């Protein structure tokens, strides 16, 4: 299968970038990583001593889901989605939930079970001020959770690759905790075609 994808690999440590055709990464024997110096590094379970933490982002329709699905099939790889983590952290009984409930107590955004009605919440946070307030609570909590998972997995020493997909990977400075950032690039015409399906 030929994927029309490109990966912009950026080392979170050095900031060096490299554009590569991602189809060359999609092999069954091992994951290949293009290092900042241009060399290819095998990322199979046998060659890695320390867990590698990779952050993935890219535009809508770029092919992130396909890549994440592929990575999930590999031994020693765990995939996390920042959006799913945020939803979990906003459930009743969590610290985030209580802070948000205090902040939006006057708003009609609650389901009968006390959870947020996401559609109503989206209309309330349409203003920059309220959206920034919500993000100021949720985003730090998500990053803290992810950092805890990464630290735990490193200590356990079982996982070889931890992958995080996050829309705001760069804006939220995940380079502070990821070893590498991967930006998935696909031509605009292909992205539009995918979104029309």
Residue ranges and their predicted role:
Residues 65:
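Walker A/P-loop
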Residues 62:
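ATP-binding Walker
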Residues 59:
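P-loop (Walker A) phosphate-binding loop of NTP-binding proteins
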Residues 77-90:
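Short beta-strand-centered segment that lines the nucleotide-binding/catalytic pocket of NTP-utilizing
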Residues 147-155, 162-194:
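ATP-dependent NMP and nucleoside kinases share a basic, alpha-helical "lid"
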Residues 87-158:
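ATP-dependent small-molecule kinase phosphotransfer cores
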Residues 56:
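Hydrophobic anchor at the beta1->P-loop junction of P-loop NTPases
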């Amino acid at each position: 299968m030929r994927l029309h994808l490109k990966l912009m690999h950026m080392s979170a440590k050095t900031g060096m970038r490299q554009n590569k055709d991602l189809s060359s990464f999609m092999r069954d024997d091992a994951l290949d990583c293009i290092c900042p110096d241009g060399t290819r590094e095998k990322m199979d379970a046998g060659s890695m001593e320390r867990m590698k933490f990779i952050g993935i982002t890219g535009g809508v329709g770029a092919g992130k889901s396909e890549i994440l699905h592929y990575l999930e099939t590999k031994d020693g790889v765990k995939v996390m989605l920042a959006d799913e983590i945020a939803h979990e952290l906003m459930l009743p009984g969590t610290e985030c939930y209580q802070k948000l409930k205090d902040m939006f107590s006057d708003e009609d955004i609650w389901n009968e079970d006390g959870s947020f009605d996401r559609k109503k919440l989206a209309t309330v946070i349409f203003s920059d001020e309220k959206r920034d307030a919500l993000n100021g609570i949720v985003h730090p909590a998500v990053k803290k959770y992810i950092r805890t998972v990464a630290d735990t997995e490193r200590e356990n020493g079982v996982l070889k690759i931890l992958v995080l997909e996050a829309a705001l990977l760069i804006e939220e400075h995940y380079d502070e905790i990821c070893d590498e950032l991967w930006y998935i690039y696909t031509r605009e015409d292909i992205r539009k075609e995918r979104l029309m399906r």
